[in-house]
Each structure stands twice: as C-alpha cells, then as structure tokens.
Amino acid sequence: MANNKSALKRAQIAERNRVRNKTYKSSVKTLMKNYLSAVQAYAANPTPESKQEAQTRLAAAYSRIDKAVKRGILHPNNGARKKSRLASKLKPIEQTA
C-alpha cells in the first residue's frame, strides 16, 4: 500500500476516478443496448414511430459516447468505433424498409 501521504492521496483519487469511470462506461453500454433493442423492434415492425424511437435512442447513445470521449473516459478511436457500429446496425434496415 501507499507509504506516504501523497501516495495515499493518489491511491484514493485513482479509486474515486475508477468508480466514476466505471459508472460512465456502464451508462454508455446501457444506452447502446437500449438502441439495439429499438433497432430490433424496428426491424420486426417497421413503422415511423419505431424508426423515430430508434433514432432518438441513437442520439442519446451518441451524446453519452461523445461526453465520455470528451472527459477522457473513452479513447477517441474507441468512441468513434462504437458510434460507427451503432450506425451500421440501422442503415441496412432503413434501406430495405
């Protein structure tokens, strides 16, 4: 464990940041899952309402991913990759519907 006050403080700060980052990453994953379920609902029943719901959830997921990147929780390339994968889920369904 830490041998002096500054090392102890850094350990406490690291733990605080770890918990904060974990909750933020968890919320990103939750919003991504919500979006994917909305896309599946739209694929099963392509209505304008379900498409709007999917687009709304996509915007929410994009927003949370961008904020995580801005705060340094996710690497910029990781955020871009997540956003790209989310967009690629809806695009083929929109073209066929």
Curated annotation (Swiss-Prot):
Belongs to the bacterial ribosomal protein bS20 family. NCBIfam families: S20 (TIGR00029). Gene3D superfamilies: Ribosomal protein S20. It holds the Pfam family Ribosomal_S20p. Disulfide bonds: none annotated. Binds directly to 16S ribosomal RNA. GO terms for molecular function: small ribosomal subunit rRNA binding; structural constituent of ribosome. GO terms for biological process: translation. This is Small ribosomal subunit protein bS20. GO terms for cellular component: cytosol; small ribosomal subunit. Keywords: Ribonucleoprotein, Ribosomal protein, RNA-binding, rRNA-binding. Residues 1-20, 75-97 are annotated as: Disordered.
